[in-house]
Amino acid sequence: MGTPLIGIFLSQRFGAQTIFYVGVATSCYFVSRALFQIPIGMISDKIHHDNDEILILFLGCFIMGIVYILIPFITESWQYFLLMSVEGFGTSMNLNSWRKLFASNLDKRHEGVGYGFYETIMSFATAIISLVGGYFSSLGNVAFEIVLISIGFAIIIGGLVSASILLIKDRKSKNI
Protein backbone atom coordinates (compact mmCIF):
# COMPACT_ATOMS: atom_id res chain seq x y z
CA MET A 1 0.00 0.00 0.00
CA GLY A 2 1.49 3.31 -1.09
CA THR A 3 -0.13 5.43 1.62
CA PRO A 4 2.68 7.99 2.12
CA LEU A 5 3.10 8.75 -1.57
CA ILE A 6 -0.65 8.71 -2.20
CA GLY A 7 -1.05 11.09 0.74
CA ILE A 8 1.44 13.50 -0.83
CA PHE A 9 -0.40 13.18 -4.14
CA LEU A 10 -3.77 13.92 -2.51
CA SER A 11 -2.47 16.82 -0.41
CA GLN A 12 -3.19 19.26 -3.23
CA ARG A 13 -6.81 18.09 -3.24
CA PHE A 14 -7.45 17.86 0.49
CA GLY A 15 -5.11 20.52 1.88
CA ALA A 16 -4.53 20.62 5.63
CA GLN A 17 -6.87 17.67 6.26
CA THR A 18 -4.69 15.28 4.23
CA ILE A 19 -2.80 13.80 7.19
CA PHE A 20 -6.07 13.07 8.99
CA TYR A 21 -7.57 11.56 5.83
CA VAL A 22 -4.53 9.34 5.29
CA GLY A 23 -4.96 8.07 8.85
CA VAL A 24 -8.66 7.35 8.31
CA ALA A 25 -7.99 5.70 4.94
CA THR A 26 -5.23 3.54 6.43
CA SER A 27 -7.64 2.46 9.17
CA CYS A 28 -10.29 1.66 6.55
CA TYR A 29 -7.74 -0.48 4.70
CA PHE A 30 -6.68 -2.49 7.75
CA VAL A 31 -10.20 -2.91 9.18
CA SER A 32 -11.45 -4.16 5.81
CA ARG A 33 -8.47 -6.47 5.46
CA ALA A 34 -8.97 -7.80 9.01
CA LEU A 35 -12.69 -8.42 8.48
CA PHE A 36 -12.22 -10.43 5.29
CA GLN A 37 -9.03 -12.46 5.86
CA ILE A 38 -10.60 -15.20 8.00
CA PRO A 39 -13.76 -15.69 5.88
CA ILE A 40 -11.64 -15.86 2.72
CA GLY A 41 -9.30 -18.33 4.41
CA MET A 42 -12.31 -20.45 5.40
CA ILE A 43 -13.57 -20.46 1.81
CA SER A 44 -10.19 -21.52 0.46
CA ASP A 45 -9.91 -24.30 3.06
CA LYS A 46 -13.27 -25.83 2.08
CA ILE A 47 -12.15 -26.74 -1.44
CA HIS A 48 -9.27 -29.24 -1.53
CA HIS A 49 -7.43 -28.23 -4.65
CA ASP A 50 -5.69 -25.01 -5.60
CA ASN A 51 -8.09 -23.76 -8.26
CA ASP A 52 -9.98 -21.70 -5.68
CA GLU A 53 -6.78 -20.14 -4.31
CA ILE A 54 -5.66 -19.23 -7.82
CA LEU A 55 -9.05 -17.70 -8.65
CA ILE A 56 -9.14 -15.78 -5.35
CA LEU A 57 -5.56 -14.58 -5.97
CA PHE A 58 -6.51 -13.36 -9.45
CA LEU A 59 -9.63 -11.58 -8.18
CA GLY A 60 -7.66 -9.97 -5.35
CA CYS A 61 -5.06 -8.67 -7.80
CA PHE A 62 -7.78 -7.41 -10.13
CA ILE A 63 -9.53 -5.53 -7.31
CA MET A 64 -6.25 -4.04 -6.05
CA GLY A 65 -5.28 -2.97 -9.57
CA ILE A 66 -8.62 -1.24 -10.15
CA VAL A 67 -8.12 0.71 -6.90
CA TYR A 68 -4.79 2.13 -8.11
CA ILE A 69 -6.30 3.01 -11.48
CA LEU A 70 -9.11 4.92 -9.74
CA ILE A 71 -7.00 6.84 -7.19
CA PRO A 72 -6.15 9.69 -9.62
CA PHE A 73 -9.87 10.37 -10.00
CA ILE A 74 -10.53 10.91 -6.28
CA THR A 75 -12.17 14.27 -5.58
CA GLU A 76 -13.72 13.67 -2.15
CA SER A 77 -12.35 12.12 1.03
CA TRP A 78 -15.11 9.48 1.19
CA GLN A 79 -13.93 8.16 -2.20
CA TYR A 80 -10.45 7.72 -0.75
CA PHE A 81 -11.84 5.89 2.28
CA LEU A 82 -13.98 3.64 0.07
CA LEU A 83 -11.09 2.81 -2.26
CA MET A 84 -8.80 1.95 0.65
CA SER A 85 -11.54 -0.29 2.09
CA VAL A 86 -11.84 -2.03 -1.27
CA GLU A 87 -8.05 -2.37 -1.43
CA GLY A 88 -8.13 -3.99 2.02
CA PHE A 89 -10.64 -6.52 0.71
CA GLY A 90 -8.53 -7.20 -2.39
CA THR A 91 -5.38 -7.51 -0.30
CA SER A 92 -7.04 -10.03 2.01
CA MET A 93 -7.91 -12.14 -1.03
CA ASN A 94 -4.42 -11.77 -2.43
CA LEU A 95 -2.40 -12.49 0.72
CA ASN A 96 -4.38 -15.47 1.98
CA SER A 97 -4.34 -17.32 -1.31
CA TRP A 98 -0.78 -16.35 -2.26
CA ARG A 99 0.66 -17.46 1.07
CA LYS A 100 -1.18 -20.77 0.91
CA LEU A 101 -0.01 -21.43 -2.65
CA PHE A 102 3.55 -20.33 -1.90
CA ALA A 103 3.82 -22.49 1.22
CA SER A 104 2.45 -25.57 -0.53
CA ASN A 105 5.04 -25.28 -3.30
CA LEU A 106 8.09 -24.80 -1.09
CA ASP A 107 10.77 -27.44 -0.87
CA LYS A 108 10.19 -28.69 2.69
CA ARG A 109 13.94 -29.01 3.24
CA HIS A 110 14.53 -25.36 2.34
CA GLU A 111 11.47 -23.49 3.62
CA GLY A 112 13.53 -20.84 5.40
CA VAL A 113 15.54 -20.09 2.28
CA GLY A 114 12.35 -20.00 0.19
CA TYR A 115 10.72 -17.49 2.51
CA GLY A 116 14.00 -15.58 2.70
CA PHE A 117 14.16 -15.23 -1.08
CA TYR A 118 10.51 -14.19 -1.22
CA GLU A 119 10.93 -11.48 1.44
CA THR A 120 14.18 -10.27 -0.14
CA ILE A 121 12.54 -9.92 -3.55
CA MET A 122 9.51 -8.15 -2.01
CA SER A 123 11.73 -5.78 -0.02
CA PHE A 124 13.84 -4.80 -3.02
CA ALA A 125 10.75 -4.44 -5.23
CA THR A 126 9.08 -2.21 -2.63
CA ALA A 127 12.24 -0.11 -2.31
CA ILE A 128 12.53 0.34 -6.07
CA ILE A 129 8.83 1.13 -6.51
CA SER A 130 9.00 3.64 -3.63
CA LEU A 131 12.05 5.30 -5.16
CA VAL A 132 10.47 5.50 -8.62
CA GLY A 133 7.13 6.63 -7.15
CA GLY A 134 8.85 9.31 -5.09
CA TYR A 135 10.74 10.56 -8.11
CA PHE A 136 7.63 10.72 -10.30
CA SER A 137 5.59 12.37 -7.56
CA SER A 138 8.23 15.12 -7.47
CA LEU A 139 7.57 15.77 -11.18
CA GLY A 140 3.96 16.74 -10.55
CA ASN A 141 0.52 15.23 -10.38
CA VAL A 142 0.23 14.16 -14.02
CA ALA A 143 3.39 12.06 -13.84
CA PHE A 144 2.29 10.53 -10.55
CA GLU A 145 -1.18 9.79 -11.95
CA ILE A 146 0.49 7.88 -14.78
CA VAL A 147 2.55 5.94 -12.20
CA LEU A 148 -0.56 5.05 -10.18
CA ILE A 149 -2.47 3.90 -13.25
CA SER A 150 0.59 1.93 -14.43
CA ILE A 151 0.86 0.26 -11.01
CA GLY A 152 -2.82 -0.66 -11.28
CA PHE A 153 -2.33 -2.31 -14.65
CA ALA A 154 0.85 -4.04 -13.45
CA ILE A 155 -1.07 -5.53 -10.51
CA ILE A 156 -3.82 -6.75 -12.85
CA ILE A 157 -1.20 -8.28 -15.17
CA GLY A 158 0.37 -9.93 -12.12
CA GLY A 159 -3.04 -11.44 -11.40
CA LEU A 160 -3.23 -12.79 -14.94
CA VAL A 161 0.25 -14.26 -14.60
CA SER A 162 -0.77 -15.89 -11.32
CA ALA A 163 -3.81 -17.38 -13.06
CA SER A 164 -1.39 -19.08 -15.46
CA ILE A 165 -0.43 -21.36 -12.55
CA LEU A 166 -3.45 -23.39 -13.63
CA LEU A 167 -1.49 -24.39 -16.75
CA ILE A 168 1.21 -26.16 -14.70
CA LYS A 169 0.02 -29.76 -14.55
CA ASP A 170 2.47 -31.16 -11.97
CA ARG A 171 2.34 -28.33 -9.42
CA LYS A 172 2.66 -29.34 -5.76
CA SER A 173 -0.30 -27.22 -4.70
CA LYS A 174 -2.77 -28.96 -7.01
CA ASN A 175 -4.26 -31.08 -4.21
CA ILE A 176 -3.98 -28.80 -1.18
Segments and roles (model prediction):
Residues 93-106:
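Intracellular juxtamembrane helix-capping segments at the cytosolic ends
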Residues 53-69:
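Structural signature of the two symmetry-related core transmembrane helices
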Residues 135-155:
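A membrane-interface helix-boundary motif in multi-pass transporters
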